[in-house]
């Protein structure tokens, strides 16, 4: 046959993944739903004193993109929170107006165009499709005709599909079938592309700010409302997309995202798996000290972080007044 032993094993597991995910492109898997439940559960457990500390603040506002995966994420996250904190009242909202800032796409989508061109240029000079094909196929002469001549496109599609396996209920990481060198080159191509498409790249110096601004304005306004003395808001939650979250954290300049890098500088200095994996989230957690100051700390993917450009007030905490001024000035 045309398949080597590695090719047969890859094809076997790929078939299971394809059958499981038939008709579900872009949807949340059961594994993803479980992870969102866990994030909500951990938030409730970690900040139980905050949720229980004010008997008048009982409303949890939940806003989601209209995307089905975001709606299910919202449901599962709040299920986890409910199991930890009793007595809260949940308000669920979605709609086109909310999608507009939770998944903002400027036209033309310059980030996708520029990053895609950079990725394919890298692949044509650095990637090793022949090694990958020889690993999976006993004969490779037919591949160029089969894919219309673009072997780099075919290699990219194989890699992208292999990345999906570990996200499914089957849970098999198909990348383990890749030889080391082609695996590394494929990761480098995609990793640098993510940065150029959505972060503080030198190629697109204003893109992150352009995408993040509508969402950041909403965040500031909703925090201001929640912090009013007569507010009943215990938490205000948004469920959106990585294509907006990554520009947001880049524009804000949290640790690990504030550098401005070119496509060629990204690998070795930044890892997409650390900053924009499935279920990525940013949390602003508010406190009031004995002097009445409103303090806030930032968590990214449930770990405390900071903004190197803005000095904290004490430990991981900012005065909200200072952080608010910084954020407002960044979009003014």
Predicted regions and their residues:
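Signature for phosphate-centric chemistry
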Residues: 1-61, 65-236, 240-332
